Amino acid sequence: DQNTYDVFRDGSEEIGNNPDFQKYKGKLDFVFTSPPYFNREQYSQDENQSFKKFSAYEDWRDNFLRPTLTTAYEYLKNDRYICWNIADIKVGSDKYIPLEQDSIDVVESLGGEYKGIYKMLMTRMVGIDASSVKNSVKIDNTYYKFEPILVFYKP
């Protein structure tokens, strides 16, 4: 057997509509991805960027987050896992946009199971009090910020 690959330039919210990509439906062994955190990660000012196409969070959730997770789930084989690196976004002093819970809700609505979270530690950031950050963990009396990796299972 020879390994092959295809490169697609479609956005993750649209790739499931690409006829050339559809041959992979139900054939992926594992999915690991880190989608943009709504409008916090702006990779470019291109009009096709998700934060440009969907400027309101509810639009982004319904037209980017949901189709991206749906494609990841549907293209995964049964009895396999998705690792999804996404974090809630802080708005103001004490409110958050619930990207983590919204992701869990989408996968569970598809029949997937939320299995838990891995905490990917970040390097220490100068000028940031990691103990005051939502996603932080204390190790040897030092606080570290972490990126959540949500783990989902497709039965």
PLM feature spans:
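Class I S-adenosyl-L-methionine-dependent methyltransferase catalytic core
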Residues: D1-P155
